[in-house]
Amino acid sequence: MSESWQQPPQTQPQQPQAPQPQHHAETPPALAEHTLPPGSAENPLGCAVYGILLQPDPGLQPPQHAPLQAGEPGPKCGVCGHDLAHLSSPHEHQCLAGHDRSFQCTQCLKIFHQATDLLEHQCVQAEQKPFVCGVCKMGFSLLTSLAQHHSSHTGMVKCSICDKTYKPAEAAEPATTTAPSLPSAPPPANIAPVEQPEKPYSCPVCQKPFKHLSELSRHERIHTGEKPYKCTLCDKSFSQSSHLVHHKRTHSSERPYKCAVCEKTFKHRSHLVRHMYAHSGEHHLFRCNVCELHFKESSELLQHPCTPSGERPFRCGECQKAFKRPSDLRQHERTHSAERPFKCDLCPMGFKQQYALMRHRRTHKTEEPFKCGLCEKGFGQPSHLLYHQHVHTLETLFKCPVCQKGFDQSAELLRHKCLPTSTERPFKCPVCNKAYKRASALQKHQLSHCAAAEKPLRCTLCERRFFSSSEFVQHRCDPAREKPLKCPDCEKRFKYASDLQRHRRVHTGEKPYKCPSCDKAFKQREHLNKHQGVHAREQQFKCVWCGERFLDVALLQEHSAQHSAAAAAAEGAYQVAACLP
């Protein structure tokens, strides 16, 4: 849309007039009363206050209206005959009668009667925000959203073209284009809007502040669980419309985001941005300033719990358990109290964790799509319906091959231990004449009479042999249980080589762990650590007279008393010597 819409010819062109100085009233006018020129070469259909740029489709021409002739009552539309005398410009009339409509989307070929409708439609498709607030420079996709946003500014705002002031709170309608063209001028640098609180809206539940009322409304759905945006193709619902738009792409093959390098397409913009890292070579764009870790996405950096050297600064006041994140501490503190902040909106029950509330809410669901064809009873899962139908058919799916007892579930059959009621033992061993009730028990017994060579399966750890693979699997021999390592001096067995090496020092007398403060040595490291605590305590209590150190403060006090007594005795002897002639 590089070409601009040329204005229809006028029979009585107006003479250009010099711009008159503006005399502003004491009370600033509202935005609806504020007039702006129809546009410039760069913005022929736009409003300089709202920052709107409107251009029609270049491939289509607007319906041409008949020019005004002398003696005629007034201009009329050449297509529909609509009277245009009350309009300041023929552009304000969009003809609805002709089929040659002026504003058509180049992507989906949808036709619009007004340029603003086309612009809003294209912005939603391309996820652009061309409607910019003149106060805070915030962008919006819809003009109505910008008008609603203007009500949040209560300070006086200057027009960027004619320097008039107006109240954005009264801006319910966009500015009209009835005034003559004025030269554009930049706004004065010394005039700024009145500062407002950054986040004036707060959540009544968790007191979290927000800058815009729409953000607060979207946040409140977290507490209420409301999901007003439902998918028409499945039963899923979402709390935000953008989530629904992303979800709908899973039902279709639409992939609107295309890589300009390799022409690979994606369903979501975030996937395309992540893919572009492969071409740019910047695989980790976000870096933590504390631990120097890199992340591909900013969300990963924000969720990264940076705690250098494994620190856990958040400690519970009840049990002194430490945590890395304050959220983990708050979640843990609920175990010590009766607080249940997650309440069910259908019953008075409360829960300490959110996942417990979500699991409980499933019990309130009344949807039972699986109906029984005989009694019309409904079930939430097809397996529950299958088990229920056994009541009508009197059939059991799982039967015991020994006693023919039936069970509804396979787990009940596995737990069933079938034992014949009679005391007969018809299965006898031909070697030792021992009798058994089952043939499987006799076969298992006969393996005990087999020679070692007849057992093909051998454990490589304990050298035991087995006849069947099931026995070999159940054996589960591993070094952690069998203690395969044996001491060559006392034949004591150990599980691990480190245990055996530590034990060998008993026989060799080796003491590899030496104290750096004294000449003592130890066989085990834990003994050295315990000994070094003695030196640490010695450093705490030092005598100020002679520098000697002690393990206990009582010993230091007793030692200091000796210095005090000696000093007192020396002072008394000096006084006596001074009195003698």
UniProtKB/Swiss-Prot annotation:
Key word DNA-binding present: yes
Q: Which parts pass through the membrane?
A: none
Q: Which SMART domains match?
A: ZnF_C2H2
> Residues where Phosphoserine occurs?
280
- InterPro entries this protein is in? Znf_C2H2_sf, Znf_C2H2_type
Positions annotated as zinc finger (C2H2-type): 75-99, 103-125, 131-153, 201-223, 229-251, 257-279, 286-308, 314-336, 342-364, 370-392, 398-420, 427-449, 457-479, 485-507, 513-535, 541-563
List the GO terms this entry assigns under cellular component, sorted alphabetically.
nucleus
- According to UniProt, the name of this protein is Zinc finger protein 319
Entry keywords, A to Z: DNA-binding, Isopeptide bond, Metal-binding, Nucleus, Phosphoprotein, Repeat, Transcription, Transcription regulation, Ubl conjugation, Zinc, Zinc-finger
Cross-linked residues for Glycyl lysine isopeptide (Lys-Gly) (interchain with G-Cter in SUMO2) are 129
The organism sits in which domain of life?
A: Eukaryota
User: Which species does this protein come from?
Assistant: Mus musculus (Mouse)
Family assignment from sequence similarity? Belongs to the krueppel C2H2-type zinc-finger protein family.
Write out the GO MF terms.
DNA binding; zinc ion binding
Where is it mainly found?
A: nucleus
Which residues are in coiled coils?
none
Function text: May be involved in transcriptional regulation.
Q: What residue spans carry the region label Disordered?
A: 1-39
Q: Where in the cell is it found?
A: Nucleus
Record keyword Secreted present:
no
The residue ranges flagged as biased composition, category Low complexity, are 1-22
